[in-house]
Amino acid sequence: MIRIKDNFKNYKKHKKILKLSKGFIGSNSKIFKISNQKIMKALYFSFSDRKKKKRSNKKIWINRINYFLKNYFFNNFNYNKIINKIKLNKICINKKILSEIIINDYKTIYKLKNMLT
C-alpha cells in the first residue's frame, strides 16, 4: 500500500487557521496546533465580550443620566424617578438616546423637563 503524505483537506484547513491567526505573536501564528488553540480562545472571548460591551454601555448611559439629573437638572430627582415619569407620560425614549441628548442638545432636555413637570 502506498503511503499518502499530502491530504488536500487538511492542507486547506491548516491554511485557513493560519490565515486567521495572522498578526499573532511568535509561534501563535506559525504553528498550526498552537494557532488553532489561540483562534478558538479568541473567538470564544470575542463572543462573550460583545455581550459585556452591551452591559457596560448600558451602565455608562445610566450613570450619565443620573449624574446630569442630580447635578444640573432636577434638585431631588434621580434616574429611577425620571424613567418612571417618562413611562407614565408615554414618552418613547430609551436610555441611549436620552444620554446622547444630555450630551449634545440642551434645548430638548428643557422641553422634556417641561413635559414631565
UniProtKB/Swiss-Prot annotation:
Q: What InterPro entries does the entry give?
A: Ribosomal_bL20, RIBOSOMAL_L20_CS, Ribosomal_protein_bL20_C
As for subcellular location, the record says:
Plastid
Keyword Ribosomal protein assigned to the entry: answer is: yes
Q: Which GO terms describe its biological process?
A: translation
The protein's GO terms of the molecular function aspect are: rRNA binding; structural constituent of ribosome
Superkingdom of origin organism:
Eukaryota
Q: Which Pfam families match?
A: Ribosomal_L20 (PF00453)
- Give the UniProt keywords, A-Z: Plastid, Ribonucleoprotein, Ribosomal protein, RNA-binding, rRNA-binding
Q: Does the keyword Cell inner membrane apply?
A: no
GO cellular component terms, semicolon-separated: plastid; ribonucleoprotein complex; ribosome
Regions annotated as coiled coil: none
Q: Which family does it belong to?
A: Belongs to the bacterial ribosomal protein bL20 family.
Q: What does this protein do?
A: Binds directly to 23S ribosomal RNA and is necessary for the in vitro assembly process of the 50S ribosomal subunit. It is not involved in the protein synthesizing functions of that subunit.
Q: PANTHER family, per this entry?
A: 39S RIBOSOMAL PROTEIN L20 (PTHR10986)
What name goes with this protein? Large ribosomal subunit protein bL20c
Organism (species): Euglena longa (Euglenophycean alga)
Instruction: Give the gene symbol.
Output: rpl20
